[in-house]
A protein has these predicted regions:
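Short glycine-/acidic-enriched loop or helix-start segments at secondary-structure transitions
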Residues: 87-88, 115-117, 140-141, 188-191
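ER/Golgi luminal nucleotide-sugar-dependent glycosyltransferases, focusing on the catalytic module
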Residues: 144, 190-199
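A glycine-rich beta-strand to alpha-helix segment
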Residues: 165-194
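C-terminal helical cap/extension that packs against the catalytic core
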Residues: 10-15, 75-76, 119-176
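Cofactor-binding loop segments of dinucleotide-utilizing enzymes, especially the Rossmann-like FAD-
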Residues: 107-111, 133-134, 181
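Nucleotide phosphate-binding/pyrophosphate-handling subdomain across enzymes
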Residues: 20-128
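Extended acidic/charged loop-beta regions that coordinate divalent cations
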Residues: 1-23
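Active-site catalytic pocket residues across diverse enzymes, especially alpha/beta-hydrolases
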Residues: 47, 94, 150, 193-197
Length: 199
């Protein structure tokens, strides 16, 4: 596969070139999306898809819960990264778009996930961890067990039984907040945000 060449960021989207295509723009935020978009472009090119359609397709591409900006001032990002590779991608994007900025992390995960490396990667530049849990999922690791696991790695945080509680606590700190560790948590968070909008 031809290697994509980064041409810089536009907000949280990335400009890139690949093959015979120049100045393409990803539709999904996050630096690692360049590789995904480049693969899609080359596949479309091989199938004879027009350049105009390729550009429109990239612009229209959306993937909720993947470096999704939920709000600004302070910025809140949801990323469904739930394994080492996903968390590495998240950390890469954070260092690109928010260099040196301190953050709060809201984290939940499934009990069968290996999280030592993920938590260690997230710990750098994190001022506060909020450990929560996914509702109504028998595979979910409890917030208390998650906090205990993190403590064995030298990472301390606040235990929050719901993502709503964690969200409000993190928001009170008025800094970049990242929510990650499980795609299942996205449903709980959007349910909470939708309920608070209607109050």
């Amino acid at each position: 596969m031809a290697t994509p060449i980064s041409e810089g960021a536009e907000g949280y989207l990335e400009r890139f070139s690949v093959g015979n295509y120049r100045h393409l723009l990803t539709g999904i935020p996050g630096y690692p999306q360049i590789e995904n978009a480049a693969l899609a472009v080359l596949a479309c090119d091989a199938l004879g898809v027009s350049e105009e359609a390729i550009r429109k397709g990239l612009a229209a591409a959306k993937n909720p819960a993947r470096f999704e900006i939920l709000r600004e001032h302070p910025t809140v990002i949801y990323d469904g990264g739930h394994n080492e590779n996903g968390i590495r991608s998240l950390v890469t994007s954070l260092s690109r778009y928010f260099p040196g900025e301190k953050k709060s992390v809201i984290f939940a995960c499934m009990a069968d996930k290996e999280i030592d490396v993920s938590l260690s990667l997230l710990a750098e530049g994190t001022d506060a961890f909020f450990f929560t849990e996914v509702k109504d999922n028998p595979r979910a690791l409890s917030a208390e067990d998650l906090a205990a696991k993190a403590e064995t790695l030298g990472i301390r945080g606040t235990v929050c039984k719901t993502v709503g509680e964690a969200y409000e606590a993190a928001l009170a700190a008025d800094r970049l907040t990242v929510i990650c560790g499980s795609l299942y948590l996205y449903r709980d968070l959007t349910d909470y945000l939708n309920k608070t909008k209607t109050k």
